[in-house]
Amino acid sequence: MTSKLEQLKKITTVVADTGDFDAIARVKPVDATTNPSLLLKAAAIPGYADLLNACVNDCKGDVGLASDRFGVAVGQEILKVIPGRISTEVDARLSFDTEAMLKRAHRLIELYDKAGIGRDRVLIKIASTWEGIRAAEKLEREGIQTNLTLLFSFAQAVACAEAGVFLISPFVGRIYDWYKKATGNDYQGADDPGVQSVTRIYNYYKANDYKTVVMGASFRNLNQIEQLAGCDRLTISPDLIEKLAADTGKLERKLSPGKTGEARQSLNEAQFRWASNEDAMATEKLAEGIRQFARDQEKLEALLAAKL
């Protein structure tokens, strides 16, 4: 029998959500994504010690540069075992500063370039704030493709599409977490608010012929993944990928182009901010996500600073 993983791979590009290249080599995804939290976990893996030490050389005390070098070094290793692309994230503490995000994105691309890795194999991850979307819009015009992360609302998805970003990462599990805590309900199947969010965005993009790739992210269980079978891409943790590989049940396609979606919309900054303000879940989860990534960035930098 064909596993659910193999069935999924026929209709969706499977991406590994991890910085552990041993796990990536084991599950064999097309692409991989990292973030500050995953890099912090990777830094604790004994096999990464030499990589971590090498990243602090010649940094002249610049812990931010050392951190970027580590992110790129991890990406470089991952690219040795995947055929596709690596997503590397801009420092979350810059999420409300367009120019600072642009500078950091350019530095990441420069570091990849020095390592002999072309921009066609890299996606720059940026938080889906208004400022982040504006930075991504400029990067796309420069030929640097982006992955807009921490996306929790339809307004964020609309703004990203209008900006022409290459890919968005709408979160499923964190939306589910918020609604479960707020209501006490344990949502299942198509009733899951995270699943509903990604489905709505996917249908909207396809109905309006947006080229932006929809990559569902942040999964809590296999059912959430199965409910989004057919999505352009899904970024999944290695443990859930392995569970899919062990399941030989039938996988039904849930998402496909051609279904009815909402009419094309456009949001200016004031409209975007108002829509965000009206969405308590998205406001709270975006702020929480940025704070968590920022704290993990600081922990990673403290680890690197001790080696400088």
Curated annotation (Swiss-Prot):
UniProt-recorded name of the protein: Transaldolase
PROSITE patterns: TRANSALDOLASE_1, TRANSALDOLASE_2
Pfam families in the record: TAL_FSA
Quaternary structure and interacting proteins, as annotated: Homodimer.
The UniProt record lists the keyword Transferase: yes
Chief location: cytoplasm
Record: active site: K125
Catalytic activity: D-sedoheptulose 7-phosphate + D-glyceraldehyde 3-phosphate = D-erythrose 4-phosphate + beta-D-fructose 6-phosphate
